[in-house]
UniProtKB/Swiss-Prot annotation:
Keywords: Ribonucleoprotein, Ribosomal protein. The gene is rpmH. Residues 1-17 have a biased composition (Basic residues). The keyword Iron does not apply. Belongs to the bacterial ribosomal protein bL34 family. This is Large ribosomal subunit protein bL34. It comes from the Bacteria. It comes from Pseudanabaena sp. (strain PCC 6903). GO terms for molecular function: structural constituent of ribosome. InterPro entries: Ribosomal_bL34. One of its GO terms (cellular component) is ribosome. Residues 1-26 are annotated as: Disordered.
Length: 46
Protein backbone atom coordinates (compact mmCIF):
# COMPACT_ATOMS: atom_id res chain seq x y z
CA UNK A 1 0.00 0.00 0.00
CA UNK A 2 1.43 3.37 -1.01
CA UNK A 3 1.16 6.35 1.28
CA UNK A 4 -0.82 9.45 0.36
CA UNK A 5 1.52 12.03 -1.16
CA UNK A 6 -0.89 14.97 -1.07
CA UNK A 7 -1.92 16.01 2.42
CA UNK A 8 -3.84 19.26 2.70
CA UNK A 9 -2.81 21.70 5.40
CA UNK A 10 -5.66 23.80 6.84
CA UNK A 11 -3.25 26.49 8.04
CA UNK A 12 -1.68 26.91 4.60
CA UNK A 13 -5.10 26.95 2.91
CA UNK A 14 -6.35 29.65 5.27
CA UNK A 15 -3.24 31.77 4.81
CA UNK A 16 -3.41 31.66 1.02
CA UNK A 17 -7.12 31.56 0.25
CA UNK A 18 -8.88 32.42 3.51
CA UNK A 19 -11.19 35.39 4.01
CA UNK A 20 -8.64 37.60 5.75
CA UNK A 21 -5.99 36.81 3.15
CA UNK A 22 -8.43 37.80 0.39
CA UNK A 23 -9.30 41.08 2.10
CA UNK A 24 -5.65 42.15 2.23
CA UNK A 25 -5.21 42.62 -1.51
CA UNK A 26 -7.31 44.66 -3.96
CA UNK A 27 -7.75 41.66 -6.27
CA UNK A 28 -8.78 39.50 -3.32
CA UNK A 29 -11.44 42.04 -2.39
CA UNK A 30 -12.61 41.90 -6.00
CA UNK A 31 -12.95 38.11 -5.66
CA UNK A 32 -15.10 38.48 -2.52
CA UNK A 33 -17.20 41.16 -4.22
CA UNK A 34 -17.77 38.94 -7.26
CA UNK A 35 -18.75 35.97 -5.10
CA UNK A 36 -21.14 38.15 -3.08
CA UNK A 37 -22.79 39.45 -6.26
CA UNK A 38 -23.24 35.89 -7.52
CA UNK A 39 -24.94 34.98 -4.25
CA UNK A 40 -22.43 32.38 -3.13
CA UNK A 41 -23.20 30.73 0.20
CA UNK A 42 -19.46 30.30 0.88
CA UNK A 43 -17.32 33.31 0.03
CA UNK A 44 -14.06 31.49 0.69
CA UNK A 45 -12.92 27.91 1.18
CA UNK A 46 -12.01 26.54 4.61
Amino acid sequence: MTKRTLRGSVRKKKRTSGFRARMETPTGRRVIKARRSRGRVRLTTV
